[in-house]
Amino acid sequence: MKKYHLFTLLFLSMLTSSAIGQAYDYCDTKTLKDSCKDYIDKPYKYDASNIILVTLQKKAQMKEVELPMFMGESYKLIFNTYALPPGVEIHVYNKDADHDNRKELFSCNSSGAKKMFVFDTEHFHSKLYVDYVIPANRAAADGSMPTVQGCAVMVVAYK
């Protein structure tokens, strides 16, 4: 019985690690994250990072990430969009998508030549919301839908 449980546990862990490895095959997140850290200069210190995996679908998508902040602290958000497909927009807001009166604090786009973006928070908020607006996948000339994937890395630093 113990061998059965051990075998099952081993099989599940291999299956899980295989699935995780496949999810990141198209995205070298460590390299992207390390390049973001190069933009952290004193007196800022590394706090956290976020990886967003993107697969273009038939319809446009929006993914929102909530960032809790400490009131009175200054933050720096560093975005690396080298591995994003063209057309993905990144917007930073003071409120979530459910609020009509939210204010856009920062935005950038993955389509241009510039791929590294830095946002220094001069406003003190308890939370920031990062919205990734992902365009719809366009069909190829033969009508097939090619798989378009990518990722972005956001690093948060505080002062």
Give the location of each predicted region:
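Hydrophobic beta-strand segments within beta-rich accessory/binding domains
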Residues: 64-67, 73-82, 130-132
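Sec-dependent N-terminal signal peptides
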Residues: 4-15
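Non-catalytic, beta-strand-enriched accessory regions in extracellular/secretory proteins
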Residues: 48-70, 74
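Surface-exposed loop/edge segments in extracytoplasmic proteins
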Residues: 49-53, 98-107
